[in-house]
Amino acid sequence: MGQKINPLGFRLGTTQGHHSLWFAQPKNYSEGLQEDQKIRDFIKNYVQKNMKISSSVEGIARIEIQKRIDLIQVIIYMGFPKLLIESRPRGIEELQMNLQKEFKSVNQKLNIAITRIAKPYGSPNILAEFIAGQLKNRVSFRKAMKKAIELTEQADTKGIQVQIAGRIDGKEIARVEWIREGRVPLQTIRAKIDYCSYTVRTIYGVLGIKIWIFIDGEE
């Protein structure tokens, strides 16, 4: 059986960069990692609570964290920052203050910036949120997958693969369904592939969504 490696870790240093940029003494590394995870979770929860109600998509593609001696710089890459900014004009300042209180970092200042992504549906995280929203609203999984593929076509991607696993449509036996459009060369290290795995809770149980997007070709 072929084993599937995580496509992002597989390409680190070639087409994929790190989402956390900092150095620490070996004994402090685990603390730094836990802090990063807490920052990411805190931001995601805040955005979830304060987004406009009508939107089921949080629109966070990724969160990058850069740490210096006196500063923690957090860059949130969002597909639809308007939804957050319109619902709370002072949202970013408020988030910054709450995060600073939460982490009580005495000698480190915390700074948050939001960057808009030009083609939000080219990001697997945003697409996975879209599919999750559809599945929660009891839209058929095939319809949700096809709609997601249509949305990526607007973002000029070269290929996409979507996989949903679990008790699909409430069936008794769990199964895996997938659909692919275009090329998705997982074995080519120079191929820029974006990937995410996402868990969605439906009334029938937990479903897992995996999305691979082939962005641009081998140089």
Swiss-Prot record:
Give the GO biological process terms.
translation
Report the GO molecular function annotations. Answer: rRNA binding; structural constituent of ribosome
**Record's subcellular location:** Plastid, Chloroplast
One Gene Ontology CC term in the entry: chloroplast
Keyword check for Hydrolase, yes or no.
Answer: no
* Annotated Pfam families: Ribosomal_S3_C (PF00189)
Check the record and name the Gene3D superfamilies matching this protein. Answer: 3.30.300.20, Ribosomal protein S3, C-terminal domain (3.30.1140.32)
Keyword Cell membrane belongs to the record? no
Domain (KH type-2): residue spans on this chain = 43-118
Alphabetized, the UniProt keywords read: Chloroplast, Plastid, Ribonucleoprotein, Ribosomal protein, RNA-binding, rRNA-binding
Which NCBIfam families does this UniProt record tie to the protein? rpsC_bact (TIGR01009)
User: How is this protein organized at the quaternary level?
Assistant: Part of the 30S ribosomal subunit.
What is stated as this protein's family in its record? Belongs to the universal ribosomal protein uS3 family.
Recorded protein name is Small ribosomal subunit protein uS3c
Organism, per UniProt? Panax ginseng (Korean ginseng)
